[in-house]
Amino acid sequence: MNYSLHLAFVCLSLFTERMCIQGSQFNVEVGRSDKLSLPGFENLTAGYNKFLRPNFGGEPVQIALTLDIASISSISESNMDYTATIYLRQRWMDQRLVFEGNKSFTLDARLVEFLWVPDTYIVESKKSFLHEVTVGNRLIRLFSNGTVLYALRITTTVACNMDLSKYPMDTQTCKLQLESWGYDGNDVEFTWLRGNDSVRGLEHLRLAQYTIERYFTLVTRSQQETGNYTRLVLQFELRRNVLYFILETYVPSTFLVVLSWVSFWISLDSVPARTCIGVTTVLSMTTLMIGSRTSLPNTNCFIKAIDVYLGICFSFVFGALLEYAVAHYSSLQQMAAKDRGTTKEVEEVSITNIINSSISSFKRKISFASIEISSDNVDYSDLTMKTSDKFKFVFREKMGRIVDYFTIQNPSNVDHYSKLLFPLIFMLANVFYWAYYMYF
């Protein structure tokens, strides 16, 4: 029994030793393979100073950039900015990282902390962040000739100065500008790798309210107190899709104007109906005007195209309400004039009788005076009183004629002319409005 256990133990020991020998040989072969295909990072960075740029003290580092625009998630008129997610790729030469062997190899993103990288920042950026899911979205790749590729995935909110005077028929020009934070033109020079072809993705974007008309790249210089810096500029034009606003604002406001014209076909005597239509359309237009401004900046420097149109519509709606007030007032004046005509005839008869009686009284007094002529016995008070009443009547008649000159003789004509003039003037206003804002 002891002999059998001893034999089994010896066999197990021999098997274990054999496996260890094979494993060590495999590790040696793998290690040799790694050394042949990839340079040792520790050997490559031996004596490497990440705080000094390549060619330190010599020619500036040439950094070539490319951009992929993944998305433009929002464009805010109220904040005057846009938010975009971009893939930023930078390439430069670092002679300290030249190696022999394979064409290139990719390092773990955490090793970027041991290398020199440009201090590129986004000009006019309000806030930016680097994506960290599931790890930091960074890539570092080394090429055998010393070229370094450094890629980042960034979401940034960038300021964009907008001219909203033609809103919503406007075209906005926004920029994405890249520049070195600390290295001026003597240390770092930025360039686009392939000109306009250095930017990709914009032509495939689909935005809610905009269409990207065109874009182009520029290389400019930024003169600041700390030096002269190279700045890369991506400039793109955004044309707003006006169809959305036509359906949301222009069509409802136009329908409200047309609805206000319905009152022209309603009788002047239907006071509640016409008043209700006028007040309702005015309040609806006011609500529409307030709602159109909720998503826009509350500044006094912009009189937008949509404000002009809503102002025109409000003027026509309010004008229709005033038209009924004028027509109804004229109707009341006409009825009052008829009553005054009847009263006038009665007053004329009364004045004639008064004058005749005054003349008769005067004649009688003259006959009495023929018996005994005495100026003290003649009484002119009755005649003077009746004559002043006549002057008052003549004055009222003159004033009445002046008022009648400015009074509408036939109130029904007000509605008749309004049926033609309101639609005609509104159509002419639309022609001038759309021609100006679409083509000028």
Swiss-Prot record:
Among its keywords, does the record have Signal? yes
Where does it mainly reside? membrane
InterPro entries on file = GABAA/Glycine_rcpt, GABAAp_rcpt, GABAAR_pi_TM, Neur_chan_lig-bd, Neur_chan_lig-bd_sf, Neur_channel, Neuro-gated_channel_TM_sf, Neuro_actylchol_rec
Q: Which positions, given as ranges, span the membrane? A: 242-262, 271-290, 302-322, 420-440
The intrachain disulfides are C160-C174
Which parts of the chain does the record assign to the membrane side Extracellular? 24-241, 291-301
Activation/inhibition comment: Allosterically potentiated by alphaxalone. Allosterically inhibited by pregnenolone sulfate. Inhibited by lanthanum. High sensitivity to inhibition by zinc. The binding of pi subunit with other GABAAR subunits alters the receptor sensitivity to modulatory agents such as pregnanolone.
Q: Which UniProt keywords apply?
A: Cell membrane, Chloride, Chloride channel, Disulfide bond, Glycoprotein, Ion channel, Ion transport, Membrane, Signal, Transmembrane, Transmembrane helix, Transport
**Molecular function as annotated in GO:** GABA-A receptor activity; GABA-gated chloride ion channel activity
What is one GO biological process annotated to this record?
chloride transmembrane transport
Q: Name one Pfam family in it.
A: Neur_chan_memb
Cellular component GO terms, alphabetical: apical plasma membrane; chloride channel complex; GABA-A receptor complex; plasma membrane
Provide the residues annotated with a glycan attachment (glycosylation). Answer: N43, N102, N145, N196, N228
Q: Give the tissue specificity.
A: Most abundant in non-neuronal tissues including the uterus, ovaries and also expressed in lung, thymus and prostate. Expressed in the hippocampus.
Domains: entry comment: GABAARs subunits share a common topological structure: a peptide sequence made up of a long extracellular N-terminal, four transmembrane domains, intracellular or cytoplasmic domain located between the third and the fourth transmembrane domains.
What is its biological role?
Pi subunit of the heteropentameric ligand-gated chloride channel gated by gamma-aminobutyric acid (GABA). GABA-gated chloride channels, also named GABA(A) receptors (GABAAR), consist of five subunits arranged around a central pore and contain GABA active binding site(s) located at the alpha and beta subunit interfaces. When activated by GABA, GABAARs selectively allow the flow of chloride anions across the cell membrane down their electrochemical gradient. Pi-containing GABAARs are mostly located in peripheral tissues.
As for family, the record states: Belongs to the ligand-gated ion channel (TC 1.A.9) family. Gamma-aminobutyric acid receptor (TC 1.A.9.5) subfamily. GABRP sub-subfamily.
Q: What name does UniProt use for this protein?
A: Gamma-aminobutyric acid receptor subunit pi
Which gene is the coding source of this polypeptide chain?
A: GABRP
